[in-house]
Amino acid sequence: MAHAIDDLKMVHEEEMKNYDRIESAVVSVMRRHGCKIIQTPTFEDYDTYGTYFPQLQREMIKTISSEGEVLVMRPDVTVPLVKTASREYPDARQLLKFGYVSMVFREYYGKSTHGKYFLQSGGEVLGDETPECDGEVMVMAAEFLESVGIRDMRIDLGSVAYMDALFEELRLSKEELSQVREFLEKRNLV
């Protein structure tokens, strides 16, 4: 009798229809914002992720190539996207907008689910560090969620640079800044 591997499953027609619906809606949003739709390779060099995401090493799904190289199934889309963009578009001042909907392969544990792969979508904007660009990315994230029927949402920003700029603009006292940072740290522990 064949042994079933935990967390691997057949994706049936109804779920495929849902994937197609989500992909179509999200790609439509990305195209409205001027993104080029891309697909990164399914297999990537292990060392690339070991360097940039050492915290993912245990969650990555690894294999050995026929040449003996350690490869990983795509655990993330941003790293290969940025590597490829820097190689194919060497003019760093050029505005580049990319969008993707891809299966990502790594172990994950959510509040009610776990598995070894999931559908991930996103947009990457390179070459524009303005607040307006940050705002557009946040609008695009909200439009992604709305396009698939999610109306009740909260978007959290995790960028230290963004938060530092916001705090500077708010001109908080040291005590106020300390209290806000404490609240933010506690929020991340919940």
How does the language model describe each region?
Residues M1-V79, K83-V190:
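Extended, charged alpha-beta segments that form solvent-exposed binding/catalytic grooves
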